Every structure is written in structure tokens, then in C-alpha cells.
């Protein structure tokens, strides 16, 4: 919102520019004034929207031309003053002043000020004035209005500057086509969206209650009964197709229908006693035509629109910082709002949103589309047998969106009208300035009460931050969150997609189709008597490496689900190699899953079999042990896979290689042992390594290489890669370094 307004007065000599400014300041007529008065500043208390106003006088003499041009370029609004007693000063406005301003490249509102009205001889009708001004306003669209005044009487002096302020704070040009006398398309689109958001029951009408909610939201006060009646009388009396409906002694508000003969049932502005969208647009057209632009602008700004009639970034993209180790979830307010809009758009009351109902729900969003284009929605969440999104699936989908990209959730909460009227309530107080009346009462151009435009409500109240994982670990090891993220990794054809589809209740697909793009699904899972939302993601061969190389993305996962085909001899080697290639995987909570248990078990081509591998990692998962978990999606045997993933996410200690605190080993009691082994290798070479092997009774050929920490593993791995060109000896050294690093972990059992 603008904080200041700069008004520049221009015009021919002796038209009274300086006298007008002096009369405003002195609040009285001053006969002798300076030719050019210094700039004055009006405090925010005397201006709409509490802005600071600077008024600048200028001279039209040739010697001051440079200063005149500089001030015109700095102006937010220009008042061209002419003298009613000197008709030539008015004639020069369209022939000199307006073309001259355009030649400077200045595009700001212009107010025409007819001064010295006290010197006019005879009466002039409004029609005559309009005829005189119409050609000028038709040719020069920057002309907002014309005000006649007198500094001597005085008359309308403060109104001159008030209308100048209004021209900046509530501009006409973005809203109204003064040549065609219609609302501009962007304004129509914005007002239609606002109408739909205020139509709480989605019946295409604004009832008395909805109009009152709208009034409270925008102006912080309810409508009185007579004001409601006045609105309806006003919109019904508009000429429609050449016909004008008169109601004389009848009350539109009381009639409500055509039964009493007062209102034709086909009237486009009012139906069944409620305001239609056409009536809503007509009402705002009247506001603008009668000089009440502040009313329409207040409505637009309340719903987040800026001067360009697009939703402001501060509304759609509010600041919401997410500290490390924290995640974002919907707050109770957010879940309530999403539940409310689900229920109001579920027109057939079948507990699910069909495609048509979803289209209706997102009609207030950009391009009338939901944010999940190209993601497989609604198959990514829970649907009924017809593919319609259930309430459970709807809330789950938004929980996933908030977890993965909370900015999208914030934007769509704004598009969908968060908060709803029941959530926002009335925030009025005795100290709130008087609002602008919704009905445009009073003569055109009359001055309404000043007010501050309310800001749109912040959408961040619909979200909440979770506690950092480290904080949760200190508090009895349990993570206090309700939405968890799991990455599903494994070789092609191992059954990852089947696991994801099964979680959201989709049928098993016999035909194999390789995953070409990232796939995300979400569902509710019962875990320890609580309902959790579990998000599972599969990346496909094209994107898997990209995600695993990105530390930030990988660290966002709560659980890594390693999937292998128990009937394929090469399947387990893929995930074993993956863990060695991306060492950070070794430090993350993990669950190993053997799929296709309905097929014959195959011996895996790997140094050790999967069950031995899991035991040697030191995994102790509640209800499973080390693993792996054997399942068959084809036979419907999932063995509480999803509940187990949530259990690990809540308390990951037993699912991490060697225990949850192994990252601290370099700073614990084994630090001396770790560096001692390093010294032995450096000083004694191969002999020292042989001694270590004898003392610790570990086979010299051991190449298991289970890393003790992500940082240590990464360091040794980079060294091994650097020595890779050195032939077979380099490979052996890398293996010995891996062995020493592995031995330094206090959590790896001696049976390895």
C-alpha cells in the first residue's frame, strides 16, 4: 500500500494555484500570496489511508520551465487549475497542458480544477458542465474528474486535494472504461472471484447473511436492515433491456420473489430476494460512476488485490520460514477450512468430490485448475470406487502438498478464500474508524467517511511448524509429528510402484510399466492408536540419482524403504550398491522390504544374504527385528508395511545402522581408537594392518565396509575414488580404510 502522495498544481498564470494552497493551509482566504509557495506536507491524520501528502506549487513562466517539468515527472497526481473567469485558461487545457504533459511521458491521474467560481456570472446547470467537459475527458483518459471551487468564499478547497488523493489511492483507470462506461475485464474477473468466494453455500446468490458476512469482512461492520433494502431497491431499478422496474411503495427486501408481483422472477440482478453476480457487478459500477471508488478498492484490497488487479505477492506468498530439521503441516484451522470447502462443494452429498465438483471448487484459482496437474491426481490419494476424491483423500492430498511444498498450499489457500467467514469472524472494535457505507448514498462526488483499507487475512495461520527432529529425539525419542515422508528405492521391476498404489487402495497391475517420472502418494495410516499421514515417493531411474545426490532433499525423508524382488537373484545387489554409492543413506532410518513373496525365493548374488545383511547393520525394528519384511502385493499380504514405516518414523532409533546416535562416535569414547588405527596405517603400513587384524580377529579380506557416519564415509569414499586409477592395490587400500572406519564404530557388533 502506498505511504505518500505527491500532488503537483500546474496551469496558466494568475489562475489561483498559490492562493488555493495558501487557503488550504490557513483555512481562510489570503489576498496577497507568494507567486510560488514552497511545498507543504499534510500529516497522515488528514488523509485517506493515513498517507503523507505533499503539495507542490509550480510556475508556468519560461524561466521556471525546467523546474516545472521536473515536478510534473515526480508527481503522483496533477491538478491543472484554470480560472472560470478566464475561459481561455480552460481552452488551453486540451490544446496545450494535456498534450504537454503527455509529451513528457508522464502517465498519472489528472484533476481539472475550476477556480474562482465566485466570479461566474449566472447559473450553470450540471448538464451544461458535463457537455463542456465530456469532449476533454473522452480524448484524454487520464482526466479523472473536475472540481469547481473558490478560494475567496471559500468553497470546495479541501475537496480539490481530497479528490487528488483519491485519484492516487483509488485510481479509476484500472477499474473502469470511462469511454465505454463499463467495468474493465480485469475488474470484472476480480469481482466475480470475490462474489464466488462470498457465496458460502455456492448457490450462485448472495443472501442477506452472506452480504452481511461480506460487509463485516470488508468494512468491519454489519449492514442495517434499511441498507440491505436500499441495495436491493437500487439494483432492481436498473434498466434491463430498455425496461425499468419501479417499486414505489413496495419493499424489495421484503418481497423476496415474484409471488407478490413486485419483482419479475427473471430479473438478472435479484433472484429469490438474493443478489446475483450481475447485480453485484452492477452495484460496483454504480459505486464508481458515483465517485465511490474507495468502496470498490476496499473490497478488492480486502481480498488481496493490488493496483494492477492481480493478487499481491504478500498475500499469495507470505513469509513463512522453516528452520532446519523442521517440517510444515496443516494447523487445525487449515484442516477445518479444507473440510468446510470440501463439504460445501460436495453437492450430491456422497462424501466424495467428482471431477465436476473439483472444477467448481477450483474456479477461483488461476486458470481454474488444481495445483496437482501432471502428478497423477486423484490416483495419488484415496478415492471411492468411481475415482472421486473422498474427504480422507482430500485432506491427505493437502497434507502431502504442505509437507513437500508449503508455498503451494499457502498460495492455494489464498486462491480458495482462506479463512472462511466463520473462521474470520468479526474483528470490530470501538476504536475502528467508521467504514464506507456499502450503498452509494449521497450526491455523486460527495465525500464519504475516511477509513483504512483492511489487509487480507494471513494464510500462515493455516499452517504450523513441527519441532526439530533433534528436539524430539531428546524427548524420549518419539517424534511428535503427524505427516511422514518415505522414499522408496530399489531396482526396476522390484515392486515399488505396486507398494505405492496399494497404499491408496488401487488395484494390482499385472502388466509391468517402468516408472518414467516421480510418483507420490499419500494415505492415512493407523499407528499406535493415532492417525498419521504417510507420503511415499518413488523417483524412477531418471530422477533417482538426482534426488540421492541432493543432501537437502534426501535429509527431508523420515524413512528410506529399500525394496528388492525376492525372486530375482540380482535385485538385492542394487540396493546394496546404492547404499555404498550414496553414503548418506547409511545414516538414515531404513526398512528393507522383500517383495513378491508369492513367488519362489531366489538366492541373492551378494556377499551375504539380505537377512544377514540386515542383522549386521544392527537393525532392531519393533515388531520385525532386523528384517527384511516379506510381502506380496499381488496376494494382498502387506504385513502392516505402512504402519511399520510410520512406527520407524515416530521412533527411528532401531532402524538406523548401529543405532541412532552413531554420528557422535568421532567425539565420544572411541575417538582415540579411531585415530589410533589411522596412525597405525600411516606409520606401519601393511604390517600394522596385519597386527590390527590379528588383535581384533577380523579376516584380512573383509570388504563389508559398513560406514559409521555419513561424513566419515564420504571422506574415505572420495579418497578411494582418487586412488582408483592406481590399479588393484588401490582397491585393497580402500577396502582396508573402509574396514578401519567400520571397526571404529562402537555400535557394530563383533560378530561381523
UniProtKB/Swiss-Prot annotation:
Q: Which UniProt keywords apply?
A: Calcium, GTP-binding, Hydrolase, Membrane, Metal-binding, Mitochondrion, Mitochondrion outer membrane, Nucleotide-binding, Repeat, Transmembrane, Transmembrane helix
Subcellular localization, as worded in the UniProt entry: Mitochondrion outer membrane
Membrane topology of the entry:
Single-pass type IV membrane protein
Residues exposed to the Cytoplasmic side: 1-671
Q: Which residues belong to the signal peptide in this entry?
A: none
User: Which annotated residues bind GTP 2?
Assistant: 490-497, 526-530, 595-598
**SUPFAM superfamilies attached to this UniProt entry:** EF-hand, P-loop containing nucleoside triphosphate hydrolases
Report one GO cellular component. Answer: ERMES complex
The ranges of region (Disordered) come to: 426-460
> Binding residues for GTP 1, per the UniProt record?
11-18, 57-61, 115-118
- GO biological process per UniProt: heme transport; mitochondrion inheritance; mitochondrion organization; mitochondrion-endoplasmic reticulum membrane tethering; phospholipid homeostasis; regulation of mitochondrion organization
**Domain Miro residues, every copy:** 2-170, 481-651
Q: What NCBIfam families is this protein classified in?
A: small_GTP
The protein's name is Mitochondrial Rho GTPase 1
Show the taxonomic lineage.
Eukaryota, Fungi, Dikarya, Basidiomycota, Ustilaginomycotina
Amino acid at each position: 500500500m502506498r505511504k505518500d502522495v505527491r500532488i503537483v498544481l500546474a496551469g496558466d498564470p494568475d489562475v489561483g494555484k498559490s492562493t488555493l494552497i495558501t487557503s488550504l493551509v490557513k483555512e481562510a482566504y489570503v489576498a496577497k500570496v507568494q507567486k510560488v509557495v514552497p511545498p507543504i506536507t499534510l500529516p497522515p491524520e488528514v488523509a485517506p489511508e493515513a498517507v503523507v501528502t505533499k503539495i507542490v506549487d509550480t510556475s508556468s513562466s519560461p524561466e521556471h520551465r525546467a523546474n516545472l517539468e521536473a515536478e510534473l515527472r515526480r508527481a503522483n497526481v496533477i491538478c491543472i487549475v484554470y480560472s472560470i473567469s478566464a475561459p481561455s485558461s480552460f481552452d488551453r487545457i486540451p490544446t496545450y497542458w494535456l498534450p504537454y504533459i503527455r509529451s513528457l511521458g508522464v502517465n498519472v491521474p489528472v484533476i481539472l480544477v475550476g477556480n474562482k467560481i465566485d466570479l461566474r456570472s449566472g447559473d450553470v446547470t450540471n448538464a451544461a458542465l458535463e457537455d463542456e467537459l465530456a469532449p476533454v475527458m473522452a480524448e484524454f483518459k487520464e482526466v479523472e474528474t473536475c472540481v469547481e471551487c473558490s478560494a475567496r468564499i471559500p468553497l470546495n478547497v479541501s475537496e480539490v486535494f481530497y479528490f487528488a488523493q483519491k485519484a492516487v489511492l483509488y485510481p479509476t483507470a484500472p477499474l473502469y472504461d470511462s469511454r465505454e462506461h463499463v467495468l474493465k475485464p480485469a475488474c470484472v474477473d476480480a469481482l466475480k472471484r470475490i462474489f464466488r468466494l462470498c457465496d458460502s453455500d455456492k448457490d450462485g446468490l448472495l443472501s442477506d447473511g452472506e452480504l452481511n458476512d461480506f460487509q463485516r469482512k470488508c468494512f468491519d461492520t454489519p449492514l442495517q436492515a434499511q441498507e440491505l433494502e436500499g441495495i436491493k431497491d437500487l439494483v432492481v431499478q436498473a434498466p434491463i433491456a430498455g425496461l425499468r422496474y419501479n417499486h414505489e411503495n413496495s419493499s424489495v427486501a421484503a418481497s423476496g420473489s415474484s409471488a407478490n408481483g413486485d419483482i419479475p422472477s427473471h430479473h438478472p440482478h435479484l433472484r429469490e430476494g438474493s443478489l446475483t453476480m450481475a447485480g453485484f457487478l452492477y452495484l460496483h459500477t454504480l459505486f464508481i460512476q458515483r465517485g465511490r471508488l474507495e468502496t470498490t478498492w476496499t473490497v478488492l484490497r480486502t481480498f488481496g488485490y493490488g493496483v494492477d488487479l492481480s493478487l499481491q505477492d504478500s498475500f499469495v506468498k507470505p513469509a513463512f520460514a522453516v528452520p532446519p530439521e523442521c517440517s510444515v503441516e496443516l494447523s487445525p484451522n487449515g484442516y477445518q477450512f479444507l473440510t468446510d470447502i470440501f463439504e460445501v462443494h460436495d453437492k450430491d452429498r456422497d462424501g466424495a468430490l467428482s471431477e465436476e465438483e473439483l472444477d467448481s471448487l477450483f474456479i477461483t484459482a488461476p486458470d481454474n485448475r488444481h495445483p496437482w496437474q501432471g502428478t497423477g491426481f486423484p490416483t495419488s490419494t484415496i478415492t471411492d470406487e468411481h475415482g472421486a476424491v473422498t474427504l480422507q483423500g482430500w485432506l491427505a492430498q493437502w497434507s502431502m502438498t504442505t509437507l513437500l511444498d508449503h508455498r503451494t498450499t499457502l498460495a492455494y489457500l489464498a486462491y480458495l478464500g482462506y479463512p472462511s467467514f466463520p473462521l474470520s469472524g468479526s474483528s470490530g472494535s470501538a476504536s475502528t474508524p467508521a467504514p464506507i457505507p456499502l450503498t452509494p448514498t449521497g450526491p455523486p462526488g460527495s465525500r464519504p467517511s475516511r477509513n483504512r483499507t483492511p489487509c487480507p487475512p494471513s494464510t500462515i495461520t493455516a499452517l504450523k511448524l513441527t519441532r526439530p527432529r533433534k528436539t524430539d529425539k531428546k524427548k524420549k525419542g518419539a517424534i511428535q509429528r503427524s505427516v511422514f515422508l518415505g522414499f522408496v528405492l530399489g531396482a526396476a521391476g522390484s515392486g515399488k510402484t505396486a507398494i505405492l498404489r496399494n497404499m491408496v487402495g488401487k488395484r494390482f497391475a499385472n502388466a509391468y510399466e517402468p516408472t518414467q517420472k516421480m510418483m507420490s502418494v499419500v494415505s492415512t495410516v493407523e499407528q499406535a492408536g493415532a492417525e498419521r499421514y504417510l507420503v511415499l515417493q518413488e523417483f524412477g531411474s531418471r530422477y533417482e540419482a538426482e534426488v540421492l545426490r541432493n543432501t537437502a532433499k534426501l535429509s527431508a525423508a523420515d524413512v528410506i524403504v529399500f525394496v528388492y524382488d525376492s525372486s530375482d537373484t540380482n535385485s538385492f545387489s542394487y540396493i546394496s550398491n546404492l547404499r555404498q554409492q550414496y553414503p548418506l543413506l547409511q545414516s538414515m532410518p531404513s526398512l528393507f522390504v522383500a517383495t513378491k513373496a508369492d513367488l519362489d525365493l531366489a538366492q541373492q548374488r551378494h556377499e551375504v544374504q539380505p537377512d544377514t545383511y540386515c542383522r549386521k547393520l544392527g537393525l532392531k525394528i519393533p515388531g520385525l527385528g532386523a528384517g527384511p519384511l516379506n510381502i506380496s502385493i499381488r496376494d494382498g499380504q502387506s504385513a502392516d508395511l505402512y504402519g511399520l514405516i510410520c512406527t520407524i518414523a515416530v521412533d527411528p532409533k532401531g532402524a538406523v545402522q548401529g543405532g541412532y546416535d552413531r554420528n557422535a562416535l568421532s567425539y565420544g569414547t572411541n575417538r582415540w581408537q579411531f585415530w589410533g588405527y589411522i596412525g597405525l596405517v600411516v606409520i606401519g603400513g601393511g604390517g600394522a594392518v596385519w597386527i590390527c587384524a590379528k588383535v581384533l580377529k577380523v579376516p584380512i579380506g573383509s570388504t563389508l565396509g559398513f560406514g559409521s557416519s555419513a561424513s566419515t564415509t564420504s571422506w574415505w569414499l572420495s579418497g578411494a575414488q582418487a586412488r582408483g586409477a592406481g590399479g588393484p592395490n588401490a582397491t585393497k587400500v580402500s577396502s582396508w580404510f573402509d574396514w578401519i572406519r567400520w571397526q571404529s564404530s562402537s555400535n557394530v557388533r563383533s560378530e561381523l
